[in-house]
């Protein structure tokens, strides 16, 4: 997950630029200069926290986000930023507290709800994560990231029909979203609808002929259907055009074992 994108709130009076690896160091220097002149500048502490977050200096990011909340305890963006830093530090219980404060202060703050869902996923509470995502979509039904996240969790819960409905809506919004297209294919293949999954793969592969995850999904379907000849041909194509891939090697070994070619299979594990 892009942690910087999780914290969407910016101060109304001072716009923080889009931070990149190229400008983050100079931005941090600027914020430190502001703080030296006024140590109670909450926006500068907030900006400094975001800079440290990009540099993966998470403890410093937490420290300055916490200072910002103390200076301005009613700004939901600061609590979301603090929750983001705590999430990066894997302090999930603390993250839930701060993100809860952010959403209490601003119930329409969907970016904070999205991070809440990620925290619940990390602690294994998938049902709560799904509930949070559904709440997000009540506020913004076109939030693509939430739609994709929800579909992925629904698949994990074996809620195939629900996941497919969500993915259909997402693909209607973004017809070229290949991650969503692939996840819909996986939803059909996981529930055993191999024929329709292959039909979708054939449609998608015309636009994305070199998309390896799509080819791997086709390979899994071929194995599930016992179509060894097609699987062998596809494995050869994948091996000639990609870097070493553990899953491809494992599937080739299984294929060779199925063909009772034990010596060839054994070479895949040397």
Q: Model features per residue range: what roles?
A:
Residues 6-66, 70:
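N-terminal leader/linker segments that initiate helical-solenoid repeat arrays
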Residues 33-34, 67-68, 101-102, 135-136, ...:
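Canonical positions in the second alpha-helix
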Residues 37, 71, 105, 139-140, ...:
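Structural marker of alpha-solenoid helical repeat scaffolds
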Residues 54, 88-89, 122-123, 156-157, ...:
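Register position in tetratricopeptide repeats
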């Amino acid at each position: 997950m892009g942690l910087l994108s999780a914290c969407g709130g910016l101060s109304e009076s001072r716009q923080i630029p889009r931070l990149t690896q190229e400008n983050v160091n100079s931005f941090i220097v600027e914020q430190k200069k502001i703080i030296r002149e006024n140590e109670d500048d909450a926006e500068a502490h907030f900006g400094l926290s975001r800079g440290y977050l990009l540099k993966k200096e998470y403890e410093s990011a937490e420290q300055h986000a916490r200072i910002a909340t103390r200076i301005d305890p009613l700004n939901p963006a600061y609590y979301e930023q603090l929750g983001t830093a705590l999430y990066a530090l894997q302090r999930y219980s603390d993250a839930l507290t701060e993100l809860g404060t952010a959403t209490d202060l601003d119930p329409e703050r969907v970016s904070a709800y999205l991070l809440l869902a990620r925290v619940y996923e990390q602690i294994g509470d998938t049902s709560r994560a799904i509930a949070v995502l559904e709440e997000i979509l009540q506020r913004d039904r076109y939030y693509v990231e939430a739609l994709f996240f929800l579909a992925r969790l629904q698949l994990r819960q074996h809620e195939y029909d629900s996941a497919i409905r969500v993915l259909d809506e997402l693909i209607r919004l973004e017809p070229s979203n290949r991650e969503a297209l692939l996840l819909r294919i996986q939803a059909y293949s996981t529930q055993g609808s191999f024929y329709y999954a292959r039909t979708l793969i054939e449609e998608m592969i015309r636009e994305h002929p070199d998309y390896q995850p799509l080819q791997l999904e086709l390979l899994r379907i071929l194995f599930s259907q016992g179509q060894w000849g097609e699987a062998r041909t596809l494995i050869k194509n994948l091996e000639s055009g990609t870097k070493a891939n553990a899953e491809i090697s494992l599937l080739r070994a299984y294929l060779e074992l199925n063909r009772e070619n034990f010596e060839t299979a054994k070479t895949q594990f040397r």
